[in-house]
Amino acid sequence: MIKFALALTLCLAGASLSLAQHNPQWWGNRNTIVHLFEWKWSDIAEECETFLAPRGFAGVQVSPVNENIISSGRPWWERYQPISYKLTTRSGNEEEFADMVRRCNDVGIRIYVDVLLNHMSGDFDGVAVGTAGTEAEPSKKSFPGVPYTAQDFHPSCEITDWNDRFQVQECELVGLKDLNQHSDYVRSKLIEFLDHLIELGVAGFRVDAAKHMASEDLEYIYGSLSNLNIDHGFPHNARPFIFQEVIDHGHETVSREEYNELGAVTEFRFSEEIGKAFRGNNALKWLQSWGTDWGFLKSEQALTFVDNHDNQRDQGAVLNYKSPRQYKMATAFHLAYPYGISRVMSSFAFDDHDTPPPQDAQENIISPEFDEDGVCVNGWICEHRWRQIYAMVGFKNAVRDTELHGWWDNGDNQISFCRGNKGFLAVNNNLYDLSQELNTCLPAGEYCDVTSGSLIDGACTGKSVTVNEHGYGYIHIGSDDFDGVLALHVNAKV
C-alpha cells in the first residue's frame, strides 16, 4: 500500500508538472507572443517598453542566446550552431541580455528563449572561433568552452531514413554534432544552462529540434529545472513555459503526441492549412470547424503561427510577408479564432534561404528604423508593427474567454463570426465585394474597424460600422480594398 501511494504521488506530481509547463505565465489578459527574429537585446528592451507593452503583447521569443560559430556571410542559421553556453552573440552579451529581460518583465512582457539542446555546431575546417572568442574543433567533437568531448555525443551517422527512430534521434541533423541527452554529464550541462537563464528572469523556452531527442530525456531535463524567478514578478512555484519544435505532418515515426504532455508543441499543420486556405486553395467556409477537427492538437497544447523563421523561407503553401494582403487576413483569423497559444512573426527581408539579418559593413546587426507611421525600414519587416496585426492583438485581448458563435459564410470565401458580445470579424477572400447586413453580436453603437484605422480622441481614422439594437451592422469589404478583413470590438467603440 505504501509503495502504491508513493507511485500515485509521483504520478500526480509529474502530471501537475507537465500541466504547469503549458502555462505561458502571461500578465493579465494578454495573449500573444511575437518572435523578434535576430533583434539585438537592447532593441528588444526598448521595443518592450515603447511598443509591445502599450499594445498589449504578452511576450517575446528571442533568437538563441548562447555563443555560436561564426560562419562566412553571417547567415541567420549560424545562431543554431552553438559552441559554448556563454551568453554572447550578435544580439549582445550577458549583461545586455539580463538588462533586456529585466526591462521587459517590468512592463509585463515575458521572454522565451530559443534553446538548442539537441546538438552543437556542424563540421568546420580546422579550429572554429565563436562569437565570444571561444575556440572549438567541431570535426573532433571538441568544445572546450562547455566542455564537451567526443564521449558526450552520439556516434556520427547521417539521417537517410526519416521513418527510422534511431536515425532521427541519434544521428546528426544536417551534420550537426548530436549530443547524448541520456548522459548524466550532458544533462547536467543543459540543466545548468537553462537554470542560468531562469535565474536571469526568462519565462520559458522554445526547444529547437525537440523531435530529435527522446521524450524521456527531455522529461528528465524539464523536470529538473528550477522554478521561475520570483524577483521578476513570477508567482511562487511557477514552472517555465515549454514549447517544443516537433514537425509532424501526421505520418511521422516520431510523433508530436510523445511531447505534448511535456509542454506545448509547435502546430505546423496549423501553419500549412491556414496558408492553403488564404491562398485560395481551400474555401474559408470550412474554417468554421478550425482546430482539433482538423487533426490539430488540443488548444492548450498547440503553439500556433501563420509562419515561422524556417518555413517562411520554404516554397509551398505557407504564407509570409511577401503576400501581405493574404498574410494580414490569415493573421487576423489566427488571432480572432479561439484556438491555440498564438505567436506572430517579426521578420527581416530575405531574397534567399541564407540571407543574414540587416547588418553594417563590419557585419554587426543594425537596429531597426521606423518611418512616421512606426513601420520598420532599413531591411527589417516587423510584421508586428503593421496596424492590421497589432490591432488584432488588441482584439484578442478584448475578447479573451469568450466563445465563438454567430458564424456566417457565403458558401465560399466570405466569412464572419462573433466572439461573445465583445468582438466581430469579417473576411473577404473572394474576387467580388462583401456587402451584407450581418449580426455582429455587439451592443448597439458605432465601432471603429481596427484593421483599417485607429480610435484616436473618440474618432475613427478608418472605416466605422453602426450596430443597431439587434446587433446587426452593414459590412462592406471590397474585393480591391487594401485589407480583406474588418474587425470590431468593444474597446474600439466610438
Swiss-Prot record:
The record marks D310 as: Transition state stabilizer. Transmembrane segments: none annotated. Residues 1-20 form the signal peptide. Ca(2+) binds at N118, Q169, D178, H212. Binds 1 Ca(2+) ion per subunit. The active site is at D208 (nucleophile), E245 (proton donor). Monomer. It comes from Drosophila serrata. Disulfide bonds join C48-C104, C157-C171, C376-C382, C418-C441, C448-C460. The modification Pyrrolidone carboxylic acid is found at Q21. This is Alpha-amylase-related protein. One of its GO terms (biological process) is carbohydrate metabolic process. It catalyses: Endohydrolysis of (1->4)-alpha-D-glucosidic linkages in polysaccharides containing three or more (1->4)-alpha-linked D-glucose units. The keyword Cytoplasm does not apply. Its cofactor is Ca(2+); chloride. It is found in: Secreted. One of its GO terms (cellular component) is extracellular region. Belongs to the glycosyl hydrolase 13 family. Chloride binds at R206, N308, R343. Keywords: Calcium, Carbohydrate metabolism, Chloride, Disulfide bond, Glycosidase, Hydrolase, Metal-binding, Pyrrolidone carboxylic acid, Secreted, Signal. It holds the Pfam family Alpha-amylase. One of its GO terms (molecular function) is alpha-amylase activity. Its EC number is 3.2.1.1.
